[in-house]
């Protein structure tokens, strides 16, 4: 995990500005998927530079963003100064420094591909959400991964490819359901001119 964290700390300086169709589509997917859902207290895992935070806080009363990259969070804090937002440097593989039963929405974007064991994340999410709380996930599509796509960036002329773990659609669903969630929706998201979906999204709910 340290290598992945170091890579994201290096990537942070260009993350918002380089050509990245996965990042851009994820932003669109998040807005489209959550625009008709009411939420007030949000837990954003893997908030990164705050690319989705900016829109989410237009609907939320409070947001807590967790990320393992200090440099990404530095960008987020410069970009977002709202008192509604708290950013915390934390590794979601470990215990999360937030209270249980505190949020009605959790979001995870382009993060779980860097997590080898999903169960800890879903179990923790289940505890942090209130009854009826929803969990939105958007990740690189398993088919896109199998085609060789990985998170990567260029630094000083050298291509840096980040370590990722392959998770199938069923891996996400089974881990979430094992934690107690119900699946509400699943959708494939495409680039305009590609046959293979770039992203996959899930919406889960903690039973009321």
What does each of the following model-derived ranges do?
Residues 1-37, 39-46, 51, 55, 75, 136-163, ...:
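Conserved class I S-adenosyl-L-methionine
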Residues 47-94:
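Class I SAM-dependent methyltransferase SAM/SAH-binding core
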Residues 97-105:
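A short acidic, Gly/Pro-enriched loop at the edge of an enzyme's catalytic core
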Residues 105-118:
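A short SAM/SAH-binding and catalytic strip from SAM-dependent methyltransferases
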Residues 119-131:
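A short glycine-rich, Lys/Arg-flanked "PGG" loop and its adjoining helix->strand segment in the class I
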Residues 164-180, 186:
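Short alpha-helix
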């Amino acid at each position: 995990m340290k290598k992945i964290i170091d890579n994201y700390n290096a990537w942070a300086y260009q993350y918002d500005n380089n050509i990245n169709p996965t990042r851009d589509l994820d932003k669109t997917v998040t807005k489209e998927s959550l625009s008709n859902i009411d939420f007030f207290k949000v837990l954003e895992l893997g908030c990164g530079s705050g690319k989705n935070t900016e829109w989410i806080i237009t609907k939320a009363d409070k947001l807590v963003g967790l990320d393992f990259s200090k440099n990404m969070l530095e960008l987020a804090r410069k970009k977002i100064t709202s008192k509604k937002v708290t950013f915390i440097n934390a590794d979601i593989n470990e215990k999360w420094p937030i209270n249980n039963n505190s949020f009605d929405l959790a979001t995870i974007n382009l993060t779980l591909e860097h997590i080898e064991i999903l169960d800890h994340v879903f179990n923790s999410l289940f505890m942090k959400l209130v009854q009826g709380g929803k969990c939105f996930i958007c990740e690189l599509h398993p088919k896109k991964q199998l085609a060789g796509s990985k998170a990567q960036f260029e630094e000083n002329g050298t291509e840096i490819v980040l370590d990722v773990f392959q998770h199938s659609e069923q891996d996400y669903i089974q881990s979430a359901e094992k934690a107690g969630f119900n699946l509400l929706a699943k959708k494939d998201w495409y680039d305009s001119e590609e046959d293979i979906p770039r992203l996959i999204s899930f919406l889960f709910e903690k039973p009321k």
